[in-house]
């Protein structure tokens, strides 16, 4: 059976080659967690679905991978999973930090129990974790899974403090000699993102609202909170990948700026980041596979044998105005081969790049688009125009557009996570007076990831059907655009299979 599953996933034309993918099996959700640099290796954990040990147990657990270069990954044994001896029914999101003794420590959401702690002592590979004997250190009620939301709310309303916080995707860090934990809200208590503090990781005090003002409305999923330069940054999932930049003072977060990476969820969700030995803040997010849904897990695995993809690692930094900069890691350049360079290209209307085509490649160019009403590039385009994914910029509207309306003639695949209003997604992008439009585009079978002027990092899943849907086309409307240089590379696969 294992061989048959492996054969299926190897034949899947939509399985990415250099974006990390689960070796096999189910990861839906595929939330990355516990990103941590330790003993010369990058460690990353993510949620997978395993065999359910008891009725009402989802079987969610933390898988574990590590790498020396952020590109090639070693698979480790499953790190945390629910068992007969643990109170939780599933292991949900959390993070890793160093405790006061310098020991790698996990705080995670244990479904049905609460926020819990585990530590890894004397293990360079971070494969062995000891749960805290007093787990859950921040408990919540154990409730029957067949209750509807109204009954669930009735149960929790009877508990102390349960109008003040909920257990949801904790994030813990050490500030000075004090541990702090965000435990996000859910839809029962919008705007209630609670902050706890502790001196010993066992006894926690509820401090109240995490936000000093302008709280996030609705759920605050997968929060990731860290210092960046002179500011603090909160990454989270709401209507897509979002972030808030501000200050943490007087034990509250004071928001100043808010931005978006993806819109209406789309492909990207569940941000997670770490700091490496070079001081880089490196971030990942999970990518939905829209060919499946929450209610179709078993059928999907039977058909495709896998589900779970991550974005490319991204480096986050702040510019002189404390605006967020986002760019791909330099290590990706080591995958390049078979370069093609085109110079001094005049684009007026459409120009098909005959010697650049493919479904696993990188494209890079810098242009001045101001003489046209819009300038862009079509990738994974078919010769008959029935399939194409369009990336374009309008100087007049100061908008960058990601148009997925013709990405696949298979509407069933595209409808998995997109609605009609989301198929053309627009992001605000204002170029300075002498600033060019700088594009880095990564195509990886069913993934398109676009970095624009280090200001935008957009990602989507596409599922072209036509074997001819590998063309690259430049275009301009309402004027001519000069392309001084366009570079392309094919990229070596980095996944073992």
Kindly label every feature range from the protein language model.
Residues 3-6, 249-266, 272-497:
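Beta-rich accessory regions
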């Amino acid at each position: 059976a294992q061989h048959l599953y492996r054969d299926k996933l190897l034949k899947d034309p939509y399985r990415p080659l250099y974006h990390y993918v689960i070796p096999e099996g189910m990861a839906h959700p595929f939330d990355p967690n516990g990103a941590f640099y330790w003993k010369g290796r990058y460690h990353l954990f993510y949620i997978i679905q395993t065999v359910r040990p008891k009725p009402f147990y989802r079987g969610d657990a933390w898988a574990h991978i590590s790498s020396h270069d952020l590109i090639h990954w070693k698979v480790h044994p499953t790190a945390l999973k629910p068992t007969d001896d643990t109170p939780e029914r599933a292991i949900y999101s959390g993070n890793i930090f160093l405790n006061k003794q310098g020991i790698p420590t996990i705080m995670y959401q244990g479904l049905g129990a609460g926020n819990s702690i585990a530590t890894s002592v004397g293990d360079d590979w971070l494969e062995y974790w000891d749960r805290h004997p007093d787990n859950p250190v921040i408990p919540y009620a154990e409730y029957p899974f067949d209750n509807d939301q109204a009954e669930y709310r009735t149960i929790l309303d009877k508990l102390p403090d349960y109008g003040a916080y909920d257990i949801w995707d904790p994030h813990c860090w050490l500030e000075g000699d004090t541990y702090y934990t965000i435990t996000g809200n859910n839809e029962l208590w919008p705007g209630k993102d609670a902050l706890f503090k502790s001196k010993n990781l066992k006894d926690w005090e509820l401090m109240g609202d995490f936000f000093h003002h302008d709280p996030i409305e609705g759920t605050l999923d997968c929060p990731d909170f860290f210092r960046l330069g002179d500011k603090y940054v909160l990454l989270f999932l709401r209507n897509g990948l979002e972030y808030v930049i501000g200050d943490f003072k007087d034990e509250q977060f004071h928001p100043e700026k808010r931005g978006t990476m993806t819109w209406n969820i789309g492909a990207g969700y569940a941000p997670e980041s770490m700091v490496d030995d070079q001081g880089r803040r490196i971030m990942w997010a999970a990518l939905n596979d829209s060919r499946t849904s929450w209610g179709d897990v078993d059928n999907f695995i039977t058909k495709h044998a896998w589900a779970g993809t991550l974005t490319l690692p991204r480096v986050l930094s702040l510019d002189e105005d404390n605006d967020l900069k986002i760019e791909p890691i330099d290590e990706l350049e080591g995958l390049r081969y078979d370069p093609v360079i085109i110079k001094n290209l005049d684009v007026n209307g459409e120009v098909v790049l005959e010697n650049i085509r493919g479904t696993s490649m990188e494209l890079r160019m810098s242009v001045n688009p101001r003489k046209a009403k819009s300038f862009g590039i079509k990738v994974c385009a078919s010769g008959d125009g029935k399939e194409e994914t369009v990336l374009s910029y309008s100087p007049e509207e100061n908008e960058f557009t990601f148009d997925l309306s013709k990405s696949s003639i298979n509407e069933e695949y595209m409808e998995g996570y997109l609605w009609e209003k989301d198929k053309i997604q627009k992001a605000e992008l204002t170029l300075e007076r002498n600033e060019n439009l700088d594009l880095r585009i990564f195509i990886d079978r069913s993934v398109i990831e676009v970095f624009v002027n280090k200001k935008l990092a957009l990602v989507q899943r596409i599922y072209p059907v036509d074997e001819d849907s590998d063309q690259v086309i430049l275009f301009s409307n309402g004027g001519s655009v000069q392309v001084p240089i366009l570079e392309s590379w094919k990229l070596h696969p980095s996944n073992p299979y």
